[in-house]
Amino acid sequence: MKKIWLALAGLVLAFSASAAQYEDGKQYTTLEKPVAGAPQVLEFFSFFCPHCYQFEEVLHISDNVKKKLPEGVKMTKYHVNFMGGDLGKELTQAWAVAMALGVEDKVTVPLFEGVQKTQTIRSASDIRDVFINAGIKGEEYDAAWNSFVVKSLVAQQEKAAADVQLRGVPAMFVNGKYQLNPQGMDTSNMDVFVQQYADTVKYLSEKK
């Protein structure tokens, strides 16, 4: 009986220690106004944002978060309009096209690099070329660009950003209740930071 009690006590302590790793106001913050019906895990980004580029291409935050998510929990990525002027809005629509066609993974890197690294993306035509070079037919892209589905996805992205009163990117939200706070995480080591970020998302996705 004593051994069983000690084992149970150990489990309780382990659980308490695990929960204590995550503190509201440290690794995450609770939204004042929860957003009903928000995607389970929602990341906002811009192809114009240098930190978003780092998150995607250097730290691989999205990939690491996806690996940690419980079964059945989906991650969604939305592009924002408030960077890049008119071209930023074109990229939000292009991201809606990517979502509609299911080609996000094919165009993410070339769009980031075309905007920030090579600076070869300067117009809607340049964006279209990225999709064609990624294997999407021009007529398929054009049909999607002008479709009701894409227009709806653009509106959906804009509404989601307004609902959480988004101030900057990159930003990640969980269940419309919590926002990740990278500044409250361990940044002394890149791998540790990425691990803590992904673990925090997992914790919040399971939080009742």
Swiss-Prot record:
- Record-annotated disulphide pairs: 49-52
Pfam families, alphabetized: DSBA
What keywords are assigned to this protein? Disulfide bond, Periplasm, Redox-active center, Signal
User: What highest taxon heads this organism's lineage?
Assistant: Bacteria
Q: Which GO terms describe its cellular component?
A: periplasmic space
- In this chain the Thioredoxin domain maps to 20-150
Q: Where is the signal peptide?
A: 1-19
Q: Which locations, inside or outside the cell, does it occupy? A: Periplasm
CDD domains xrefs? DsbA_DsbA
Note the InterPro entries from the entry.
DSBA-like_thioredoxin_dom, DsbA/DsbL, Thiol_disulfide_DsbA, Thioredoxin-like_sf, Thioredoxin_CS, Thioredoxin_domain
Q: Name one GO molecular function term.
A: disulfide oxidoreductase activity
Q: Does the keyword Signal apply?
A: yes
User: What PROSITE patterns is this protein classified in?
Assistant: THIOREDOXIN_1 (PS00194), THIOREDOXIN_2 (PS51352)
> Known SUPFAM superfamilies for this protein?
Thioredoxin-like (SSF52833)
Q: What does this protein do?
A: Required for disulfide bond formation in some periplasmic proteins such as PhoA or OmpA. Acts by transferring its disulfide bond to other proteins and is reduced in the process. DsbA is reoxidized by DsbB. It is required for pilus biogenesis.
Q: What's the family? A: Belongs to the thioredoxin family. DsbA subfamily.
Name of this protein: Thiol:disulfide interchange protein DsbA
Q: Tell me what organism the protein belongs to.
A: Escherichia coli O6:H1 (strain CFT073 / ATCC 700928 / UPEC)
